[in-house]
């Protein structure tokens, strides 16, 4: 029988091609067996954007998760997202697959405000981010550095208490006063004691969280360039950034001109690191991005937590009385609040922990991005999917918390659950590589003033308002502050320290 070599080669080639295609089909077929997480029905073009209209996003997402599950798919215009609403699912993202979800998605507002996303918050995972993280944990926000700011903390918050005392029996806008004091503290710790140089930053620092959380159609339809051109939000972000950049340039120039061997503030530390040289160069743009991070996150987080802690205690007079009794019992002997004894305030610390559970500073943790397609809990998560962890929902999961929507500080008195990223049912600061690096700094700026307020004053709601009538609605933003400012009447009960 005659064999035609060309025909044989053709047959073998066809056979090999057939086997390769079959294997590829098998792999594709196997992959298709893994579904995406379930989610609500999508509309053409806009996807699930209509589901987020109206109520606060973290409320809406929890309601939807009760129907579709703790891992839920949403289509936000052109962007695919998965919403995480349970401790188990959060652990998969923030621990088991943490490295695969270590980067952030690109966000135009963050790119502008964060100098091309070169800050610790939005920088992509890699060498630059690791270097910034190391600088933050070892140089800027270490326990030793936090302790070094103790005299500044005490001075700023005693001054605030004096302003409260000067009001006599009239009401004060507690929300506004505390935000201003917190900014004074953070700006002096970060930029130095010459407060008049950077007072102009405060309006920008207040506005930035709202701008970064604002809805911009160009973010969900990035392929439509016209939306970027038309975006009024984007124009406002650019204007705020330019003003902030101008002020920070002046502050950096003044620091260089008045160079001191003694590192008095965090900018001094950064400039010294820049001069000494690092593995990766630290540019002025990088330094400014870190400064913006510190100013915004430091001021916003502390003021939000204190505002809610005071509101919850005024809403629940029994809790307020219990906190005051403990603080006065511990400090009456000395006649003043001493930070070195804050650790003795078990109940007040429980109030802070419960506030962080019920009102996490960032109810929706900053999004992560899926690096490579992976499987989680039987679902496929495609590469480039945006991952949003609803910390507000996770912290209120009835599987872990009895009466999960109620404010009960007592639950933490004998509870070893903490917020250091080891217990995924309680993640007010996130967890894993992207966990907030400033927990120690933030807590010090919450516990000390709260102890002072409990020690020196009795508090009443303005206008004879009854506790049950206090409005506890939230405001939409990167942090969920109170919708309405908290107006309180402080009545001094313990003498303030002399100057």
From Swiss-Prot:
> Which Gene Ontology BP terms does the record give?
diterpenoid biosynthetic process
Regarding tissue, the record states: Expressed in leaf glandular trichomes.
Query: Which cofactor is recorded for it?
Result: heme
Per its UniProt record, what InterPro entries does this chain match?
Answer: Cyt_P450 (IPR001128), Cyt_P450_CS (IPR017972), Cyt_P450_E_grp-I (IPR002401), Cyt_P450_sf (IPR036396)
Any stretches that span the bilayer, and where are they?
Answer: 4-24
Topology within the bilayer: Single-pass membrane protein
Record's catalysed reaction(s): ferruginol + reduced [NADPH--hemoprotein reductase] + O2 = salviol + oxidized [NADPH--hemoprotein reductase] + H2O + H(+)
Q: Which UniProt keywords apply?
A: Heme, Iron, Membrane, Metal-binding, Monooxygenase, Oxidoreductase, Transmembrane, Transmembrane helix
User: What are the boundaries of the signal sequence?
Assistant: none
Q: Hey, which family's this protein in?
A: Belongs to the cytochrome P450 family.
Name this protein carries in UniProt: Salviol synthase
Organism of origin is: Salvia pomifera (Apple sage)
The record lists the lineage as:
Eukaryota, Viridiplantae, Streptophyta, Embryophyta, Tracheophyta
GN (gene name): CYP71BE52
